[in-house]
Regions:
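ATP-binding pocket architecture of kinase catalytic cores
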Residues: 38-146
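Alpha-helix N-cap/loop-to-helix initiation residues
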Residues: 3, 33, 56-59
């Protein structure tokens, strides 16, 4: 499928999935993946995030499962509002624009508090996630090397 056809299908799916008047759709954020994120702004100013996650490049079922596992642990993650996995389309709740980096650079006096919260969350995920580990691939040497290649590909753009 051509990208232009995919874009039309994606926009149509969004419009059919949201039961409200959409004011606009704008690019949101990006990550080191083939996913694209768009903020959907409704006429009442509510927002959602639409995700275009091509299934030939992304494991969307695993993405949904990890979101459920983290949510079950009490970790703040976007809620899955709707999904169409055959095409890799998702609508998730919008957690806003603020990142930890934003907080660190705008409020240096509390940076140690943010790091403590982050380490606490990582510890919580490590301890609480033990029961779910069999559902996820092992983070072994090969996976770690693959993740390091992502850094080179997406951030350094050397390949």
């Amino acid at each position: 499928m051509k990208q232009s056809e995919r874009n039309i299908l994606f926009k149509s799916w969004i419009e059919n999935s949201i039961d409200a008047m959409i004011t606009r759709i704008e690019p949101a954020s990006s990550d080191a993946s083939f996913r694209s994120y768009y903020r959907i702004i409704l006429n009442n100013e509510d927002t959602f995030i639409a995700v275009d996650s091509p299934p030939e490049h992304e494991n969307n079922r695993q993405f949904l499962r990890i979101a459920q596992i983290l949510n079950d642990m009490g970790i703040a993650v976007p809620k899955i509002i709707d999904s169409e996995l055959n095409h890799g389309f998702l609508i998730i709740s919008d957690l806003g624009n603020n990142t930890m980096l934003d907080k660190l650079t705008s409020n240096n006096q509390h940076s140690s508090d943010y790091y403590k919260k982050a380490v606490s969350l990582i510890s919580k995920m490590q301890h609480s996630g033990v029961s779910s580990h069999s559902e996820l691939p092992l983070y072994d040497k090969d996976m770690m090397l693959d993740e390091m290649k992502l850094f080179v590909y997406w951030y350094c753009k050397l390949e």
